[in-house]
Every structure is written in C-alpha cells, then in structure tokens.
Amino acid sequence: SKGLTAGYLPMSCVMTTDNVYQAFYDDKVEKGFLHSHSFTGNPLACSAALASLELFERDNVLLHNQSLIQVMAHGLQQLADANLPIKFVRQTGMIAVFTLDFSQNLGKAFANLCLDQGVMIRPIGNHVYLIPPYCTTPAEIGHIFGILNHCLQKLCDHIPQIPKGSSQTIDLP
C-alpha cells in the first residue's frame, strides 16, 4: 500500500483468487464482507493511488526496480564481506535489513550517524531497515551504501570493548 500513496494517505489494495471473491460477491448485504474504516474511499487517497499507478505503468517502475534491487543486493553483499559488525543480512525487493552485531542496542546511535551524513534509515532495536523510494538512482543507492560502511566504521571506532551483558551505556560524540 505504501507504493500507492507513499504512506502519506490511507490506501490499500487487496488481491485474491476468483473463488474468494465470488464467496463475498452477492446482492445480499449479509453475504458481503462489511469491514472497513472511516478512511474508506477517501478521494484524495484514491487520486494519489491512481496517479501512482499511472506512473508505475508509464515509467515501467517495476522493471526499473529490478535493477535497483540488484544494486542493493550488491551493496548488502559488500557490507557483509567487509568484516563489519553486522549479521542476518536479508532483502526482499526494495526492502533490505541487517542487524548490528553488538551486545548493546546501538540502532538509534547508528541512525543518527547516518542522518548526519544525509541518509535516513529506520532502526528497530539493532535491526537496520533500508527502504529507498522507487525514484532512487543506482548511483544514489551506491552512495547510501558507502555512507553505511563509513558510519559502521565510525561506530566501531567509538565503541569501547564492553563485555556482553554489561549495563554500561555508550555515548557517541
């Protein structure tokens, strides 16, 4: 749904099989699936979604994304091969995730280092999510991964050797 309105407006899309659709399709109200919310059919959200779908078709966005997915996969592989403190590197389409391999929760500190370099990531604990917009270029994705590498190195440089399970906190400059 975020691809339809960039997450700014409530909009979703449901895809199903014809058998499931037919189970709910009827003129009798009691047979219908009457679940919705107060944003149902919002004209602004529908207009934004239709415009997005037109752009997807006109600009062949899904084909373009295939090349971006490959660039992201290459960047993730380089991070994984760089002997940096990350683990559980994974990717599905244009969403990539890796986990910071520290006993302390440093996701927010890492996010702040990246933000200082102009890259916004989404940390959830020590899990770092990369969700670039579809209009990102391959060069920009390469730049993002360069910054991630730099910030991981910087994070390592400022982390004292703290035993696992220690309650000592870490302050980054």
Language-model features: locations:
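Conserved N-terminal phosphate-binding loop of PLP-dependent enzymes in the Aspartate aminotransferase
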Residues: 1-173
